[in-house]
């Protein structure tokens, strides 16, 4: 069981970091600049990945790391859902707002601007991938990862009863 749970968390971390890798590919190879909401979704994927890796390493506090990973996922789901709603309403726009200034003033934007600096518009059209927008795919993967963490937590709780 121990090897299975390690593999479980490791796979979640790999998928999470792969999503960040896909975002960086789209940013640099496809020249799609990230908006503030995109950067916040990157934070969510990175949070899920880091907390999942900590769950692999620190077995005694695994439930804590799993819960924090779920919390990161819920935050990312809220942000991605908001961005999908913005894209569905063409009259709405987040434009250049205080959120962009706030995201770009974070230490991560200063330390790793290649990853965390926001330079795009939230409602900028992007080519669909298999018929869905990039934020919709982000929402789907955040839902999958968060639900996977939740199901694992529920199964473990049932196992210990």
From Swiss-Prot:
Coiled-coil stretches noted in the UniProt entry, renumbered to this chain: none
Periplasmic side: 26-43, 82-136
Membrane protein topology class: Multi-pass membrane protein
Transmembrane segment boundaries: 9-25, 44-58, 64-81, 137-155
Cytoplasmic side: 1-8, 59-63, 156-161
Cellular localization per UniProt: Cell inner membrane
UniProt key word Electron transport: yes
Claim: Membrane is one of the keywords in the record: yes
GO CC list: plasma membrane
Disulfide bonds: 35-38, 94-122
Source species, domain of life: Bacteria
GO biological process: protein folding
Listed InterPro entries: DiS_bond_form_DsbB/BdbC, Disulphide_bond_form_DsbB, DsbB, DsbB-like_sf
Keywords for the protein's UniProt record, in alphabetical order: Cell inner membrane, Cell membrane, Chaperone, Disulfide bond, Electron transport, Membrane, Oxidoreductase, Redox-active center, Transmembrane, Transmembrane helix, Transport
Molecular function in Gene Ontology: electron transfer activity; protein-disulfide reductase activity
Entry similarity comment: Belongs to the DsbB family.
Role description: Required for disulfide bond formation in some periplasmic proteins. Acts by oxidizing the DsbA protein.
PANTHER family: DISULFIDE BOND FORMATION PROTEIN B
Protein name: Disulfide bond formation protein B
Organism: Cupriavidus metallidurans (strain ATCC 43123 / DSM 2839 / NBRC 102507 / CH34)
């Amino acid at each position: 069981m121990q090897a299975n749970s390690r593999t479980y968390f490791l796979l979640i971390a790999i998928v999470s970091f792969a999503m960040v890798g896909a975002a960086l590919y789209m940013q640099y190879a496809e020249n799609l600049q990230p908006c503030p909401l995109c950067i916040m979704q990157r934070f969510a994927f990175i949070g899920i990945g880091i907390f999942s890796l900590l769950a692999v390493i620190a077995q005694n506090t695994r439930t804590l790391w799993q819960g924090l990973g779920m919390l990161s996922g819920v935050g990312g789901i809220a942000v991605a859902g908001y961005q999908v709603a913005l894209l569905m309403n063409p009259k709405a726009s987040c434009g250049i707002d205080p959120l962009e200034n706030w995201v770009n003033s974070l230490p991560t934007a200063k330390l790793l601007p290649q990853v965390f600096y926001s330079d795009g518009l939230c409602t900028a059209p992007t080519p669909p991938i298999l018929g869905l927008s990039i934020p919709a795919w982000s929402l789907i993967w955040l839902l999958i990862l968060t639900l996977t963490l939740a199901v694992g937590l529920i199964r473990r709780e049932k196992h210990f009863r």
